[in-house]
Amino acid sequence: GDALKKRVEPLAAELGAHVVGHCDVTDPESMDAVFAELEKIWGKIDFLVHAIAFSDKDQLTGRFINTTRENFSRTMEISVFSLAALSRRAEMIMNDGGSILTLTYYGAEKVMPHYNVMGVAKAALEATVRYLAVDMGSRGIRVNAISAGPIKTLAASGIGDFRYILKWNEYNAPLKRTVTTDEVGQSALYLLSDMSSAVTGEVHHVDSGYHTIGMKAVDAPDISVIKD
């Protein structure tokens, strides 16, 4: 959509990327066309970054049990099946020893308010990572996921009480802060490069250690009385 286009084009220009295209992951022909074009331009690829998810934001609030069949199916198709579909196509033009990386969230492991079906989808995504890692391992192709802490992004804007979530993580994570996009990017670079040549099927947390916490930290303030 236009909202993403306005962000992608400047980023592509900054990085000197000459190939920017449209891909509809619900349309097999669209995905086929993208990889045919990449093969035509580059011949081979070294990695694939899967950073796509979708759900009706109106169904991320309230009770998960009220998720509609239509939204559940669409969420799973776009957020989960797309990784398998894109990986299958990428494998055909990927060099041996390549890397595939996707993005997940702690809501796959524990119930998070206002995440609902996306939490279920992310759990399925993490399972998909493990199965793909086995499928593609014989060629040395690695498949991993980054589970980042909350960051102010376009996707995060659809999550209710996001500012509260940011503050909660800041006060309760072992490092007493949230994470930055640069820190997530550095972890992605590690997982996409030969520095992680023996790492596959993993969910790598970049969340200031928040995933280790079981309850409110002893020294954390009462967030209900904290003003921004």
Which residues does each PLM region occupy?
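Short-chain dehydrogenase/reductase
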Residues: 1-71, 83, 87, 129-130, 158, 228, ...
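A short C-terminal helix-loop "cap" of Rossmann-like NAD(P)-dependent dehydrogenase/epimerase domains
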Residues: 13-17, 159-173, 178, 222-228
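N-terminal Rossmann-like NAD(P) cofactor-binding module of classical short-chain dehydrogenase/reductase
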Residues: 49, 101, 205
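Catalytic loop of short-chain dehydrogenase/reductase
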Residues: 53-92, 96-138, 150-152, 210
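C-terminal helical subdomain
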Residues: 81, 145, 163-199, 204-208
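Short, flexible catalytic-loop segment of classical short-chain dehydrogenase/reductase
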Residues: 143, 147-158, 212
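Short C-terminal tail/terminal secondary-structure segment
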Residues: 189, 200-228
